[in-house]
């Protein structure tokens, strides 16, 4: 009998990785709360955000989480960062973590400032950390679904867990590189979305590629500074989980965070832009916590601060841009 993997969350990214695992021969059971989405997947055999991609026969769907995780040798989550707490609490009511649990979402929880892995440990207990894994890196779902080459990072505290997850996801076109710095991998994926919103705003004002490259470079500097106070290895952010993911998210026309930034530049409010995108915009969610943590630790993060003030304090977008451009220059420190 084929080895079973449970996948919690059937947005486009969840469907993408669930399809990858199904293509490798695993029996994948995808779960989502939305009964309409599950019914559509079961009946039409297509995902509404990828109607041109046929459903693999190894992939099935359910709204019953217990059915999804029962006898699964691995559990993968692909819900929003805001959804990982309620989903983990629902999972805890069904089972303790005794198999690898792979986080593929990117964000920092609002109000608590917890990384998504820390939320899982808080709910399941410290013993759960040995089963935790984190997958991140430059990976636009549509490109992965089409079989385009892609390189990502997988991290875990336990070497055996790391090996199992690495072997499950690795394919000739989906390159998976191990990295032992789980917190650094998680932070890179979370914070790059804020910088992508800034790049989208820059695009919205037609500032050009020079401005965007400057934002990416200085944005990476902000992310590295943030990582130092979170006990991460700053060099992790020079790799796929940091620079790689940052470049893809900031320069891709498929990036929802960049699209969101363009809408903000056009004068839409936070809620209007989110409604227009129609999907979760993780950078908008994470900006609040990132700003609060940076302020608490007295870290100078001007791009992050600017995005936070525009989104949550109704700062005029042009005033925010002017504040960035009028900052005193100093020795470039990388």
Curated annotation (Swiss-Prot):
Active site per the UniProt annotation: 192
Sections of the chain in a coiled coil: none
Primary enzyme class: oxidoreductase
SUPFAM superfamilies: 6-phosphogluconate dehydrogenase C-terminal domain-like, NAD(P)-binding Rossmann-fold domains
Pathway named in the protein's UniProt entry: Membrane lipid metabolism; glycerophospholipid metabolism
GO cellular component: cytosol
One of the GO biological process terms: glycerol-3-phosphate catabolic process
GO molecular function, one term: glycerol-3-phosphate dehydrogenase [NAD(P)+] activity
Domain of life: Bacteria
Main location: cytoplasm
Localization: Cytoplasm
Enzyme Commission number, as recorded: 1.1.1.94
Residues the record lists as binding NADPH: 13, 33, 106, 141, 256, 280, 282
Catalytic activity: sn-glycerol 3-phosphate + NAD(+) = dihydroxyacetone phosphate + NADH + H(+); sn-glycerol 3-phosphate + NADP(+) = dihydroxyacetone phosphate + NADPH + H(+)
Binding site for sn-glycerol 3-phosphate: 106, 137, 139, 192, 245, 255-257
Keywords assigned: Cytoplasm, Lipid biosynthesis, Lipid metabolism, NAD, NADP, Nucleotide-binding, Oxidoreductase, Phospholipid biosynthesis, Phospholipid metabolism
Family, per entry: Belongs to the NAD-dependent glycerol-3-phosphate dehydrogenase family.
Summary of the function given for this chain in its UniProt record: Catalyzes the reduction of the glycolytic intermediate dihydroxyacetone phosphate (DHAP) to sn-glycerol 3-phosphate (G3P), the key precursor for phospholipid synthesis.
Name by which UniProt lists this protein: Glycerol-3-phosphate dehydrogenase [NAD(P)+]
Species: Chlamydia felis (strain Fe/C-56) (Chlamydophila felis)
């Amino acid at each position: 009998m084929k080895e079973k993997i449970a996948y919690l969350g059937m947005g486009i990214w969840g469907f993408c990785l669930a399809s990858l695992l199904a293509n490798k021969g695993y029996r994948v059971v995808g779960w989502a709360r939305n009964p309409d989405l599950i019914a559509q997947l079961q009946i039409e055999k297509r995902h509404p955000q990828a109607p041109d991609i046929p459903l693999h026969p190894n992939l099935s769907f359910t709204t019953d989480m217990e059915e999804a995780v029962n006898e699964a040798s691995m559990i993968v989550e692909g819900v929003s960062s805001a959804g990982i707490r309620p989903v983990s609490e629902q999972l805890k009511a069904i089972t303790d973590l005794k198999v690898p649990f792979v986080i593929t979402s990117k964000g920092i929880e609002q109000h608590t400032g917890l990384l998504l892995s820390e939320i899982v440990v808080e709910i399941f207990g410290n013993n759960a950390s040995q089963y935790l894994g984190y997958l991140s890196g430059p990976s636009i779902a549509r490109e992965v679904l089409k079989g385009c080459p892609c390189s990502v990072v997988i991290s875990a505290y336990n070497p055996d867990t790391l090996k199992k997850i690495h072997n499950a996801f690795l394919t000739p076109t989906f390159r998976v590189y191990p990295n032992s710095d789980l917190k650094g991998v998680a932070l890179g994926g979370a914070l790059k979305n804020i910088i992508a919103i800034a790049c989208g705003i820059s695009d919205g004002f037609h500032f050009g590629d020079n401005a965007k490259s400057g934002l990416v470079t200085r944005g990476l500097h902000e992310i590295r500074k943030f990582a130092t106070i979170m006990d991460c290895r700053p060099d992790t952010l020079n790799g796929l989980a940091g620079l790689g993911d940052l470049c893809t998210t900031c320069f891709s026309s498929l990036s929802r965070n960049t699209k969101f930034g363009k809408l903000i530049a056009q004068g839409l409010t936070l809620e209007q832009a989110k409604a227009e995108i129609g999907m979760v915009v993780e950078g908008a969610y994470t900006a609040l916590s990132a700003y609060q943590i940076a302020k608490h630790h007295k870290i100078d993060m001007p791009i992050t601060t600017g995005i936070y003030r525009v989104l949550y304090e109704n700062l005029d977008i042009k005033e925010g841009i002017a504040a960035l451009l009028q900052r005193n220059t100093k020795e470039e420190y990388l």
